[in-house]
Amino acid sequence: MARLGVNIDHVATLRQARGGTEPDPVAAAAIAEFAGADGITIHLREDRRHIQDRDLKILRQTVQTRLNLEMAATDEMVAIALAVKPEACTLVPEKRAELTTEGGLDVRIHQEALKVAIEKLQAGGIIVSLFIDPDPDQIKVANKIGADYIEIHTGSFAEAKSWKEEELELIKIENAVKLARKLDLGVNAGHGLSYSNVKKVAAIGGIEEFNIGHSIMSRAILVGLDRAVRDMSELVRYA
């Protein structure tokens, strides 16, 4: 049965829009856990556009399930992760001009720097995942440099313009899962997943955790966060 990791970045985005203290992502994380989330995911960006250092520190003290920190593989972020010690870190690409993470890491190009970051984080007892496209070459290099997990970037599937394109993207994801499992890599998935499409990916099998944020927070505005998390959790677990 797959797990649901709830990304609460958008709660912080709303707070930062007015520069105040509400809504508090710490409170949102607690509600998500009460509703059945198996973990909480946050992205501490270098520009601190949404999640703040304060959020990370308090969440480390309050999260009762698992805390997954998305981060760039920089010296600053590695040092922060080692000080706070989330259960897991997901290394992601980061561009200051992007609205959200636009694609997977190019592990082949950055493998030396990523290997150093992975080794430091693992030495601190942290599970390390790499956010990558469902590309066999990227998966093989992720395994080569010692990652514990990959998180498959599902954005191309979510943005497919036709049924045929969607099917082709699903095949890529399925093949990526099979290869990662063959290499003894754990597999997570995320980006662009919603109430209308997540079951198609979950039905593939072999994916341990789905990290979902925007779709849950969008529904939460209409039905409340508790209900939104429960609905998504049911889709993920019983696909």
UniProtKB/Swiss-Prot annotation:
- Active site located where? H43 (proton acceptor), E70 (proton acceptor), H191 (proton donor)
Write down the chemical reaction(s) this protein catalyses: 3-amino-2-oxopropyl phosphate + 1-deoxy-D-xylulose 5-phosphate = pyridoxine 5'-phosphate + phosphate + 2 H2O + H(+)
Compartments, record wording: Cytoplasm
User: What GO molecular function annotations does the UniProt record carry, in alphabetical order?
Assistant: pyridoxine 5'-phosphate synthase activity
Q: What is its main location?
A: cytoplasm
Instruction: Sum up the protein's function in the record's words.
Output: Catalyzes the complicated ring closure reaction between the two acyclic compounds 1-deoxy-D-xylulose-5-phosphate (DXP) and 3-amino-2-oxopropyl phosphate (1-amino-acetone-3-phosphate or AAP) to form pyridoxine 5'-phosphate (PNP) and inorganic phosphate.
The record, for HAMAP family, names:
PdxJ
Its assembly, as annotated, is: Homooctamer; tetramer of dimers.
Q: Which NCBIfam families match?
A: pdxJ, PRK05265.1-1, PRK05265.1-3, PRK05265.1-5
List the protein's name. Answer: Pyridoxine 5'-phosphate synthase
Source species: Citrifermentans bemidjiense (strain ATCC BAA-1014 / DSM 16622 / JCM 12645 / Bem)
Gene behind this chain? pdxJ
